[in-house]
């Protein structure tokens, strides 16, 4: 699997696959001909940007890599790893399994209640979800962190000396030019309010903001 993400992703990928792939909608998959073989192309990614993920036989991977880099050489295409991907998904406010999501997390804890309708029936775990919908739940918020030290996963969030939540993801944001974090709070957040994050024993002020931090222009 090779992913091409960013505002010029479509233009670059279509140079290898042909124009028909440009009609593929987000979260859809199609067969494409690339480098003389049939592959899968999905209009997916976890960066908050437009892009494609290309699924090819393993032995074709190096050739596809070289072809993509050549196709995007004039458009600033550069190779990046998971750290860059994770920073982009953080800026886009996208929850990640192992950070914001777990086996114990419900859709109501992460602002995804719109994705489930347990009362309509036909849903695996529907009864449990319906019960969870009536119970108190956590809230995901964004934090603008003051100072130069970033908040990391697991750092406590406090208000008036009380622990009210935990940082689930945090990193410096190249787009915003400051440290940001996603936190799970145990109460309804006040957007624009302030909390303190325990960063290695030092309480650091942070401003509560709505997610996402960044939304790509359409």
Locate each region found by the language model.
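Conserved, structured C-terminal
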Residues: 1-218
């Amino acid at each position: 699997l090779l992913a091409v993400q960013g505002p010029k992703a479509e233009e670059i990928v279509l140079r290898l696959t042909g124009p028909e792939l440009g009609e593929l909608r987000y979260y859809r998959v199609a067969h494409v001909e690339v480098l003389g073989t049939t592959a899968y192309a999905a209009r997916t990614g976890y960066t908050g940007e437009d892009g494609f993920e290309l699924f090819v036989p393993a032995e074709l991977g190096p050739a596809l890599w070289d072809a993509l880099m050549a196709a995007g050489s004039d458009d600033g295409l550069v190779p990046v790893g998971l750290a860059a991907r994770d920073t982009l998904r953080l800026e886009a406010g996208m929850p990640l399994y192992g950070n914001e999501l777990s086996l114990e997390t419900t859709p109501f804890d992460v602002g995804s209640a719109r994705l489930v309708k347990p009362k309509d029936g036909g849903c695996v775990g529907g009864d449990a979800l319906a019960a969870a919908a009536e119970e108190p739940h956590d809230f995901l918020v964004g934090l603008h962190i003051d100072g130069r030290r970033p908040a990391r996963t697991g750092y406590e969030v406090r208000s008036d000396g009380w622990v009210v939540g935990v940082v689930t993801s945090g990193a410096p944001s190249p787009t915003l030019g400051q440290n940001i974090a996603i936190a799970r709070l145990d109460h309804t957040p006040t957007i624009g309010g302030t909390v303190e994050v325990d960063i290695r024993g030092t309480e650091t002020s942070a401003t509560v903001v709505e997610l996402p931090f960044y939304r790509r222009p359409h």
